[in-house]
Amino acid sequence: MMLPSSGVSVWLAAGASDMRRGMNGLALQVQQALGRDPHGGDVFVFRGKRGDLVKVLWHDGLGISLYAKRLERGRFIWPTPTDGAVCITWAQLGYMLEGIDWRNPQRTWRPASAG
C-alpha cells in the first residue's frame, strides 16, 4: 500500500509514456528523461498516449512499487509540456486518481445510479 510521508514529492512525467514498460523500464525513464533518482523516495506518475491509463512508481526504501489505474470513462488531466516533469502535491495526485481535474477539483464524471 502506498503511504509515503508528507515530505515526498510527486512528479508527473509530461508527455506520453510507453505503458508496456514495467518497473525497470519506468525507473530507467526517470533517470534518463527526467534526470532524477528513481530510488530517492519520490513518486513518479506516467500517462499513456490514450490518456486513460496511468502508472505510479515509488521506491519506499525497501523496494519499488508499481501501481496502475485505467479509467473506464474519460481521461486523466495531464500538464501540457511535452517533456520534463511537473511537481504536484499528494492531494492533487489523489484527485487525479479519482478522475477529478487536479488543477480545479470538481468531479469530471459520475457513474449512473443503479436501479
Task: Place the predicted regions along the sequence by residue.
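Polybasic/polar functional segments that serve as interface/processing modules
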Residues: 1-115
